């Protein structure tokens, strides 16, 4: 029995079939092809993990090693054979630096006391609408929400009535 189990891939063949069927160019494929795909996927994951582990051991000073997303994205960025994965596993960036570079807009609605805001000018600049962006009148939004709440709910016979929480 153990000898038979060692001949099977660790990745379920049914998962390979499911993933293959999501491809719009899917054609009928034999069971052997799915098994080969499962084995090659297993070998690829093993190789990626080993390469990531060896790079992480070089860069980290601790004896115990736990791989994380940062290690994986660094290995993909540094090793040529994994460059094709750079879009799927991008390098993480600090949110504060992205806000400073105006790559991301970040608005604090209710700042909590734990958040350290560098200066009020930066927050005011971040909250100003960009050129061409329509300004939102809060009174109009509140009026629309109240109007929607005042409308009676209608249901067809096919739809179940939502459970009331009262």
UniProtKB/Swiss-Prot annotation:
Gene Ontology cellular component terms for the protein in this record: CHRAC
Location of the protein in the cell: Nucleus
Segments crossing the lipid bilayer: none
Disordered as annotated region, ranges: 112-166
GO molecular function: protein heterodimerization activity
UniProt subunit comment: Heterotetramer. Consists of four subunits: POL2, DPB2, DPB3 and DPB4.
Protein name as it appears in the record: DNA polymerase epsilon subunit C
Organism expressing this protein natively: Kluyveromyces lactis (strain ATCC 8585 / CBS 2359 / DSM 70799 / NBRC 1267 / NRRL Y-1140 / WM37)
